[in-house]
């Protein structure tokens, strides 16, 4: 035992001297390693596709000579950019200023590694490799002869704003041998399912073939087309998407004659959903938000007629419906700040046209939400509903209702004005937003930023038509802030008569 103890003690003493040598430890304490301080002018770097990136935004402090390593890649699936995890990382440069030309459009995680021989520091950036039409507002419009155009109001980067670069492009639709005619609706989709990515910017028309153009989301180049001619109708409005199975992802739409159709994002073909039990008056995204930081929004197709509301969440489940006997449906709104995706249905009594109520259902739709009340000393479950009476309702079935991810209120259109509605009370009696005199509201949209976006959805876009406006184009765009209904920007006389507006968010 004594021999073992002496050997162990000697080993400990030798290890202590070795550690002092390795880590510059002296009897008086540790020697401080040469630190590195990294400062950057911005946490976001923008560069155009095919243009060499020469980055001069670094300010680095180090007492010793330093080396650089730049690497980039997609953010790992299921994580946020703030977690700094890569799906796959590629080292691209050892130059202080990067000096690299990117060949792929998208938004990436960029990592800088700085080493001075004693210390290592990391700095992470958001890298946007831009195609020119990466993010902004797209407006589909038609002139008096049905000639269509796709106007794009670009969301400029700070660098582009400083340079005074062009923001409004009156028509970016350019397909060899094709003319855009009688445009009706727009939709943007981006989803990865079972390892397969489906994306596209869809343009629906009422031309002689009922053409649906499937454009590349990053460049607006034509990917493929589908024709509705053989169905005897055309796409009137898009609304909702989901995966049918592991090899199929589709966007849904209402045809002009009230049928439900599906456009396959992979095969580019159109098919009718034949189990729809009624002719559809309206269809829209049942867009919901999960509370998880990395969760995706889900945009199931919701649709309704005067009597029944329906939702389709999967091919196996089919169409689920609900109705209220003795009541007509006026309109439907979705509260998107809830993880439970509550659907609010506004009803009007068939027997008393001044009597209204709002009922609530989850995204399963098959049952109304309930609450427990004390009645005559007993606990009784009753449906959640919000009744009210009015002879002057400021809403009808033509009102377009929009929610967003940061407010429980929704916006909706009525009588050429825009109102707010809390969904749990009577709709507003006074407009929240009035457009300038002469402007006729054609469509509204929010800046929904995709299935994996943050909660920065804070804008309302309104497109209008003014037949008395001078100049070639009589269509305009007005941008309002959701929090206080304030007008933040206007772009007047930039398009023809608008049919649809949509926020074209950035897609990787």
Language model: regions and residue ranges:
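Bacterial N-terminal signal peptides that target proteins for export
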Residues: 1-10
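Acidic/polar, low-complexity intrinsically disordered N-terminal segments immediately downstream
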Residues: 4, 23-177, 452-457, 465-508
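C-terminal motif of bacterial Sec signal peptides marking the signal peptidase cleavage site
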Residues: 18-21
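Beta-strand initiation motifs
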Residues: 28-32, 81-82, 158-169, 219-225, ...
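Entry beta-strands of beta-propeller and related beta-repeat scaffolds
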Residues: 133-139, 200-202, 251, 343-344, ...
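Short, solvent-exposed loop/turn segments at conserved positions within beta-propeller repeat blades
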Residues: 143-147, 196-197, 206-209, 218, ...
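Acidic, serine/threonine- and glycine-rich low-complexity intrinsically disordered segments
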Residues: 209-417, 422
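Conserved blade-ending motifs and adjacent loop-strand segments that build the rim/top face
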Residues: 384-397, 429-453, 486-500
